Amino acid sequence: MKYKNIFLTGSTGILGKPLLKKLVNEGHSVFALSRNKLNNDFLISNNAKIISGDLFNDDIYEQLKEKSIEAIFHVAGENKKCQKDPSGMFKTNIEGTKQMLELGNKLNIEKFIYTSSAATLGEKKGSIGDEDSTHRGTFLSDYEESKYLAEEVAFAFKKEFEFVSINPSSVQGPGRMSGTAKLMISTLNKKFPPLIKSSVSVVDIDDCTEGHYL
């Protein structure tokens, strides 16, 4: 990757942590968004430059405008299943993504890399779906719908800068204890009965990190 100065969101999540380390180890200057000061020790120890705030803070631009940011990795997102009120997740995943896209436009970046989900892609019976597969038009979860709609917003910015959407399946690795990881662990520990002919697509965190960097 040719870009020197990079802004990274979601830098302390399961994917953000190894991606931050990868970027720094490859010689990039990483400006990491931090909404919680408790995470700052991790960021500082990994040579990231801290940008304080969350996806909706207007002063992020002021903190970055003199940093010559060339690319944004927008990894931050919310993934919670079976919420009674998913409006917070929709705000984070859709409006938060739009905020970062508009930030990239103001910063005159060259490239925006967005962490989406395989759930936004269509299926192909008997084969693996890809970006050319037509989505079924219905959603299995609020999370899937929020990521699909976020992509729709993001693609509108393709004329402003190079836009890349990364669509991993269920990311698994050290430290992952919730979501599908919790389900698989419970099944292995015989605390949850396995479903006949059920399956889930998974991707190793290291492979996912490399895919983002490429």
Model-derived regions, located:
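N-terminal Rossmann NAD(P)H-binding glycine-rich loop of SDR-like oxidoreductase domains
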Residues: K4-E26
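NAD(P)H-binding glycine-rich loop region in Rossmannoid oxidoreductase-like domains
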Residues: F42, A48-E95, L103
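Conserved Rossmann-fold NAD(P)-dependent oxidoreductase catalytic core, especially the SDR/UDP-sugar
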Residues: E95-Y143
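Glycine-rich NAD(P)-binding loop of the Rossmann-fold in SDR/ketoreductase-type enzymes
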Residues: G88-Q99, E145-S146, V203
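Glycine/proline-rich active-site loop of Rossmann-fold NAD(P)-dependent oxidoreductases
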Residues: E160-F161, Q172-L183, L214
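Conserved catalytic-site region of short-chain dehydrogenase/reductase
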Residues: K81, A118-I128, D142, V171-M177, ...
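Conserved beta-loop-beta element that borders a ligand/cofactor-binding pocket
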Residues: E152-P174
